[in-house]
UniProtKB/Swiss-Prot annotation:
Homodimer. The record marks R58, R78, R110, R126, F139 as: Interaction with tRNA. Keywords: Isomerase, tRNA processing. GO terms for biological process: tRNA pseudouridine synthesis. The active site is at D60. This is tRNA pseudouridine synthase A. It catalyses: uridine(38/39/40) in tRNA = pseudouridine(38/39/40) in tRNA. Substrate binds at Y118. Residues 168-172 are annotated as: Interaction with tRNA. It comes from the Bacteria. Residues 107-111 are annotated as: RNA binding. Formation of pseudouridine at positions 38, 39 and 40 in the anticodon stem and loop of transfer RNAs. It comes from Shigella boydii serotype 18 (strain CDC 3083-94 / BS512). The lineage of its organism: Bacteria, Pseudomonadati, Pseudomonadota, Gammaproteobacteria, Enterobacterales.
Amino acid sequence: MSDQQQLPVYKIALGIEYDGSKYYGWQRQNEVRSVQEKLEKALSQVANEPITVFCAGRTDAGVHGTGQVVHFETTAQRKDAAWTLGVNANLPGDIAVRWVKAVPDDFHARFSATARRYRYIIYNHRLRPAVLSKGVTHFYEPLDAERMHRAAQCLLGENDFTSFRAVQCQSRTPWRNVMHINVTRHGPYVVVDIKANAFVHHMVRNIVGSLMEVGAHNQPESWIAELLAAKDRTLAAATAKAEGLYLVAVDYPDRYDLPKPPMGPLFLAD
């Protein structure tokens, strides 16, 4: 083989699950633990070359993922089992590959995505949990999930989410299109399930923080609509904690035919 002859490059997509409680977010950063850094290290070991991954959504410190999607390019030709079982063998126990799929050159985990879906899990009980303490948010006041659901429906469609946007958000626009938002109760768990084309920084956690005030009867049902119209972050409730938030699914055009495993988290039925 001549020096000029290039090896073929393969583009691979992976579905990733992780417990974010011990990580300083998804994105690789100097001197702190990140999910991206651990995944790239494991992939590089299997590929026997440096690997850089691109993700669908960069989750914050303490936030979890059951449906994160990444892609990477490599000259390494490996069987699917190497990219799943082999990579998992090199990952810490709180990160796992769920599926693998070869994708065409035009695929991008972030820019090809048409929607992202999050679930926020509230453990609504008088006493705090121990086993799932880093996987749910504890809220001791009784919550009316049906009231929260009704209040949330004003967020559907395209809206300016300035009132639910972090001050440090770097997005060029506060406008987002919410496709669905449902609030349901499953025993002691209250689940806020929201899907949108994209999210401004802390959008889900800020929405949930205000919905909990409505669910606890500290604010009227109309309050969420009033906040949305006000376009003022200072009027809304405090940001809900990170530990209850999960990135559960990312939508892509059907032509990519990516796997769609159960969304989870695993202790919840779909």
